[in-house]
């Protein structure tokens, strides 16, 4: 996939030459930062954790109060210590050298740039992103992200109700909930992080899809460290972004080796979710299009743009 694309700068409200020059400089650094993220992905195959970081930074948003959102607050130690964010300090540390190299780019933009690039570089759709976000000055409150299994923090009696409580608070509808859940097509869960699986760190604790320290998950079968082996994945090729997550119910022979949570199951059984789940299983193009739009919306929740916005 091409790693350098034209930057269109949308800055109609910028009037002075000095302000225009600032936007252009920011855009140049975004372009360079994206190249550095691509290099990081090629070296480490860290696509899933960068997507998780972008989601967890944005997913604290409350549309009613305007609090939280994609504002870089997850960089603060207090927020990284939230239970839902276990393991994400690793993702922040992956991005820290890039942030330091391009100091004018906000943490909020670096995190969302990395998440979108991670999706695109493992076969996913082009995300219509905008940049120029301001950074938060402190951490978001704990408790706004969804739980994978009961008991649910919002007191919901079932997984479908819990998903709606969390995502409707952010402004997403049922179709968008299912589309965003498709991000589980990449990545793994670990006993030491979420606790939703018995599979933990290390090759001996992985499944047949996650136990090898080298690449079995990439589409090109190229060698490449995956970092810590282990954990459990939702799909067999967990470094390839496609619609395999929605085929999970048809892979009965692999059920013991693949992760499937109550919140995943709700998408296949709830009458409001299931039609979208089945549609994405049969139409990857529809999934890609609707995921890209929903992810772009997610990436701007609670964001305050102080430059541009700049369209990559």
Indicate residue ranges for each PLM-predicted region.
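Catalytic cores of secreted/periplasmic or lumenal enzymes
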Residues: 6-312
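N-terminal chloroplast transit peptides
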Residues: 1-5
């Amino acid at each position: 996939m091409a790693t350098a694309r034209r930057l269109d700068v949308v800055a109609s409200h910028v009037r002075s030459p000095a302000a225009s020059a600032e936007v252009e400089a920011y855009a140049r650094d975004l372009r360079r930062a994206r190249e550095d993220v691509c290099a990081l992905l090629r070296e480490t195959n860290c696509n899933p954790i960068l997507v998780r970081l972008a989601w967890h930074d944005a997913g604290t948003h409350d549309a009613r109060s305007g609090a939280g959102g994609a504002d870089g607050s997850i960089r603060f130690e207090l927020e990284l210590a939230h239970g839902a964010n276990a393991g994400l300090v690793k993702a922040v540390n992956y991005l820290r050298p890039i942030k330091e190299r391009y100091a004018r780019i906000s943490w909020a933009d670096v995190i969302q740039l990395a998440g979108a690039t991670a999706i695109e570089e493992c076969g996913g759709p082009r995300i219509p992103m905008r940049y120029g976000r301001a950074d938060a000055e402190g951490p978001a409150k704990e408790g706004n992200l969804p739980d994978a299994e009961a008991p649910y923090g919002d007191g919901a009696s079932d997984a479908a109700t819990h998903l709606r409580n969390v995502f409707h608070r952010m402004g997403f509808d049922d179709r968008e909930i299912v589309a965003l859940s498709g991000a589980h097509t990449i990545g793994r869960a670990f006993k030491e992080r979420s606790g939703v699986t018995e599979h933990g760190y290390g090759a001996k604790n992985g499944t047949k899809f996650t136990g090898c320290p080298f690449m079995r998950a990439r589409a090109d079968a190229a060698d490449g460290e995956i970092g810590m082996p282990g954990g459990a994945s939702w799909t067999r090729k967990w470094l390839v972004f496609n619609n395999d997550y929605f085929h999970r119910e048809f892979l009965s022979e692999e059920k013991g080796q693949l992760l499937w949570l109550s919140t995943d199951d709700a998408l296949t059984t709830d009458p409001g979710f299931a039609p979208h789940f089945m549609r994405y299983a049969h139409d990857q193009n529809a999934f890609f299009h609707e995921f890209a739009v929903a992810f772009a919306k997610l990436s701007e929740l609670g964001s305050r743009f102080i430059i541009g916005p700049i369209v990559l």
